[in-house]
């Protein structure tokens, strides 16, 4: 395809450009300002001829440039692009970004891309065909289905049609959004590999109509909902010692792990995604994506008009005494007490329950060293340690 790049600040007005020998790319727009000459029949017929390697669909907030070998999957683009536009809108709310974007998000696939990573941080987002749909030699080859991920997955407005690669794609696209990220001063927590999963979480919850627990579970690879993420958190030696969860004796405690972005999903479930957006927005407004933990708790609580310190405390980011004092005048997070009681009830009481919980979490954790340690070193006092920590957090709310 041939695109014209207009430098920022240009004021050239309307200009006619003539290109000899060009073949029109099949294009369809669902955007109100661009669909005056749309003809769905013409679009589908042009795709069938395969005169050019790609077709393009433009939405209000999203552009899709896909190989013509997949065109038979997009003969009815309206519901697909409607779902993608809505997804971009939901991401904007979560991220604290303006509702009106300065340009549309853009996704394309090609047989070869100049990156070892799928969907690298770029404009457009590039995906390699073989990583999405399997072995394909050229973009004109007929592709039977939409492969590991496609915007088609969203059109049904249900998580039942999601494929295994969906959260991976949103993870990579999340890096392009450069979300404000906590834990920088703690060192190597690397939560930038975790909060990118918030894109999938908000889309599954707001666009695909999943409850927040299901959205959290499906947004990462561990298959952890709130209960599993809470148990994973409580089995952290750092958490048991009331220390910031970052790195333990075995591995990073936050990178790629559901318990890292569960704290934000918890806030969204209790107070709404708009509150999450307000937390993120304050960091954009001061011009940084590096969120210090105490600043996050302080400014986030003030934007939410509720003392969020207990939520951060439970999910591995304990507030300092100074932070607690400064937030004492805000309304308490009483909505969180019921959740804490639920997490307390999940704590295993007997050795049999203890081993059952660990084996379940171990099955999908990704790294097993910590779980093997706990299996080999049963401590009957551990459940009391966990309960005491939760009781202290509940007391801080009351």
Q: Where is each model-derived feature located?
A:
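Extended acidic/polar, glycine-enriched regions
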Residues: 1-51, 56
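Generic detector of isolated residues embedded in canonical secondary-structure elements
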Residues: 3, 195, 310-311
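Generic structural signal of hydrophobic/aromatic residues within well-ordered alpha-helices
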Residues: 28, 36-46, 80, 84, ...
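Catalytic cores of extracellular degradative/oxidative enzymes
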Residues: 42-46, 53-269
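Generic alpha-helical secondary structure signal
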Residues: 75-82, 273-277, 306, 310, ...
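Active-site-proximal alpha-helical
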Residues: 225-324, 332-335, 342-344
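Beta/coil-rich, acidic/histidine-enriched accessory regions frequently appended to metallopeptidases
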Residues: 291-398
């Amino acid at each position: 395809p041939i695109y014209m790049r207009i430098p920022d600040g240009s004021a050239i007005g309307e200009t006619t450009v003539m290109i000899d020998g060009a073949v029109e790319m099949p294009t369809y727009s669902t955007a109100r300002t661009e669909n005056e000459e749309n003809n769905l029949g013409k679009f589908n017929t042009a795709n069938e001829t395969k005169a050019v390697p790609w077709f393009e669909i433009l939405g209000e907030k999203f552009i899709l440039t896909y190989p013509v070998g997949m065109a038979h999957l997009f003969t009815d683009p309206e519901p697909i692009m409607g779902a993608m536009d809505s997804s971009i809108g939901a991401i904007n709310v979560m991220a604290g970004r303006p509702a009106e974007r300065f340009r549309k998000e853009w996704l394309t696939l090609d047989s070869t891309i100049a990156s070892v990573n799928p969907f690298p941080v770029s404009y457009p987002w590039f995906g390699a065909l073989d990583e999405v749909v399997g072995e394909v030699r050229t973009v004109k080859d007929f592709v039977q289905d939409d492969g590991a991920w496609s915007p088609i997955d969203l059109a049904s407005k249900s998580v039942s049609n999601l494929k295994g690669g969906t959260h991976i794609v949103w993870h990579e696209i999340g890096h392009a959004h450069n979300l404000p990220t906590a834990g920088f001063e703690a060192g190597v927590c690397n939560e930038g590999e975790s909060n990118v999963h918030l894109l999938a979480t908000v889309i599954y919850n707001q666009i695909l109509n999943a409850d927040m627990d299901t959205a959290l579970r499906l947004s990462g690879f561990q298959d952890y909902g709130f209960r599993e993420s809470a148990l994973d958190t409580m089995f952290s030696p750092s958490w048991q010692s009331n220390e910031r969860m970052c790195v333990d004796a075995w591995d990073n405690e936050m990178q790629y792990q559901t318990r890292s972005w569960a704290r934000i999903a918890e806030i969204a479930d209790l107070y709404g995604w708009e509150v999450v957006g307000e937390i993120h927005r304050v960091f954009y407004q001061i011009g940084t994506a590096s969120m210090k933990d105490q600043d996050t708790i302080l400014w986030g609580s003030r934007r939410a008009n509720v003392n969020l310190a207990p939520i951060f405390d439970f999910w591995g980011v304990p507030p300092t005494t100074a932070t607690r004092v400064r937030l004492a005048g805000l309304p308490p997070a009483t909505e969180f007490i019921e959740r804490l009681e639920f997490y307390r009830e999940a704590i295993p009481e007997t050795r049999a329950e203890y081993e059952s919980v660990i084996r379940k979490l171990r099955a999908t954790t990704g790294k097993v060293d910590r779980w093997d340690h706990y299996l080999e070193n049963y401590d009957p006092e551990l459940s009391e340690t966990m309960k005491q920590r939760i009781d202290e957090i509940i007391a801080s709310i009351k």
